[in-house]
């Protein structure tokens, strides 16, 4: 996604801070996005540095009532929270040894409360917080917003595991 395309999607004046989030090249996220991401504290990648994700709602995201479909908002929240948890996991853990596998997560539970509706053409954001980590689980919460309006609150737990290379 070019700088001009990003600037056309994000709120005015914020284009240079956002980039396409496609770190894992997930075809589902790519087809339903684009999902953009920014580091809320500059370029320093650390476990405590929060990420914010955003998307511009489109007609394809909406149901017959003209509101962004709750299923898409739930998916967006899961993508945002899982990727924040995975960042926390990979930055806080030592690099895997050869043959050990690649760190990954699976969603164990996901809960969302819808607070307001949003229509097409709106900028929607989600800034997850990893609030607890155990040896095998990460717990994350977030609010989805359009500006200052809260659209949803979400929470999730994820189990960490290593993906073994396919031979």
Residue ranges, per PLM feature:
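Terminal targeting signals and extreme-terminal segments of soluble enzymes
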Residues: 1-167
């Amino acid at each position: 996604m070019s700088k001009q395309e990003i600037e056309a999607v994000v709120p005015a004046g914020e284009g240079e801070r956002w980039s396409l989030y496609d770190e894992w090249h997930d075809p589902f996220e790519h087809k339903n996005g684009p999902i953009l991401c920014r580091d809320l504290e500059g370029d320093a990648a650390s476990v405590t540095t929060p990420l914010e994700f955003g998307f511009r709602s489109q007609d394809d995201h909406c149901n017959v009532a003209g509101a962004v479909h709750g299923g898409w908002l739930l998916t967006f929240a899961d993508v945002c929270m899982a990727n924040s948890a995975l960042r926390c996991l990979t930055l806080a853990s030592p690099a895997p040894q050869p043959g050990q596998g690649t760190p990954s997560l699976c969603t164990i539970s996901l809960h969302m409360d819808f607070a307001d509706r949003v229509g097409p053409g709106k900028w929607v954001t989600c800034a997850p917080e990893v609030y607890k980590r155990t040896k095998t689980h990460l717990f994350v919460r977030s609010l989805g917003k359009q500006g200052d309006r809260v659209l949803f609150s979400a929470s999730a737990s994820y189990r960490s595991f290593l993906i073994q290379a396919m031979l």
